[in-house]
Amino acid sequence: MSIEALKTQLPAFAKDVKLNLSALPREDSLTEQQLYGLLVACGYTTRNGTVAQALEAEAAPHLSPAALDAAKAAASIMAMNNVYYRFTHLASNKAYETLPAKLRMSVIGNPGVDKVDFELWSLAVSAMNGCGRCIDAHEAVLREAGLSEAQIQTAVRVGAIIASAAVALEAAGAGFPEAAE
């Protein structure tokens, strides 16, 4: 499956989602590895098998095996970190912020790909998962590494588009009526 095949599964009410998905492969503000790694990391973050499989199939020809694994690792490690650090940030009892996390996350320090790419994928996943503390941390690393605000915004936009595709598929499968075109 590919982005084109994924688009054929989207309902009529998701016309804008289809158009946004169509634009993803033409995104030119990111490197090929950054863009296609985003597709994989964000695809798995949706927890929608159809979306994840389609985006991995689209991305695989553009990524090394190490980059493909790193993109999946970004989705996986951020799933853990985003829950934990969102809790410590949102909890009224600030004592939780002082306790050691006791979470193994060595992949962040040694992701097997360019650290900037892994950070970019982690930022987009963190945005999808709604963890402000992680968003701020990854954005700071990316800005220090020289990425522009436009590149960072692009990564989050890619995540938003992918999230919308997953919701559209689920809404259609849940019997939501299609909007008139």
Swiss-Prot record:
Pfam families per UniProt: CMD
One GO BP: cell redox homeostasis
Membrane-crossing residue ranges in chain numbering: none
Catalytic activity: N(6)-[(R)-dihydrolipoyl]-L-lysyl-[lipoyl-carrier protein] + a hydroperoxide = N(6)-[(R)-lipoyl]-L-lysyl-[lipoyl-carrier protein] + an alcohol + H2O
Positions of the catalytic residues: 131 (proton donor), 134 (cysteine sulfenic acid (-soh) intermediate)
Physiological role: Antioxidant protein with alkyl hydroperoxidase activity. Required for the reduction of the AhpC active site cysteine residues and for the regeneration of the AhpC enzyme activity.
This protein's UniProt keywords: Antioxidant, Disulfide bond, Oxidoreductase, Peroxidase, Redox-active center
Family: Belongs to the AhpD family.
GO molecular function: alkyl hydroperoxide reductase activity; disulfide oxidoreductase activity; hydroperoxide reductase activity; peroxiredoxin activity
Cystine residue pairs: 131-134
EC number: 1.11.1.28
HAMAP family reported in the protein's UniProt record: AhpD
SUPFAM superfamilies (alphabetical): AhpD-like (SSF69118)
Name of this chain's protein: Alkyl hydroperoxide reductase AhpD
InterPro entries membership: AhpD (IPR004674), AhpD-like (IPR029032), AhpD_core (IPR004675), CMD-like (IPR003779)
Broad EC category: oxidoreductase
Top-rank lineage group of the source organism: Bacteria
